[in-house]
Amino acid sequence: MSAWMSAGFS
């Protein structure tokens, strides 16, 4: 899992 995935891939 990547940081942008955790953010909600906006």
UniProtKB/Swiss-Prot annotation:
GO terms for cellular component: mitochondrial inner membrane; proton-transporting ATP synthase complex. It is a peripheral membrane protein. It is found in: Mitochondrion inner membrane. One of its GO terms (biological process) is ATP biosynthetic process. Keywords: ATP synthesis, CF(1), Hydrogen ion transport, Ion transport, Membrane, Mitochondrion, Mitochondrion inner membrane, Transport. Belongs to the eukaryotic ATPase epsilon family. Mitochondrial membrane ATP synthase (F(1)F(0) ATP synthase or Complex V) produces ATP from ADP in the presence of a proton gradient across the membrane which is generated by electron transport complexes of the respiratory chain. F-type ATP synthases consist of two structural domains, F(1) - containing the extramembraneous catalytic core, and F(0) - containing the membrane proton channel, linked together by a central stalk and a peripheral stalk. F-type ATP synthases have 2 components, the catalytic core F(1) and the membrane-embedded component F(0), linked together by a central stalk and a peripheral stalk. The central stalk, also called rotor shaft, is often seen as part of F(1). The peripheral stalk is seen as part of F(0). F(0) contains the membrane channel next to the rotor. F-type ATP synthases form dimers but each monomer functions independently in ATP generation. This is ATP synthase subunit epsilon, mitochondrial. It comes from Yarrowia lipolytica (strain CLIB 122 / E 150) (Yeast). The gene is ATP15.
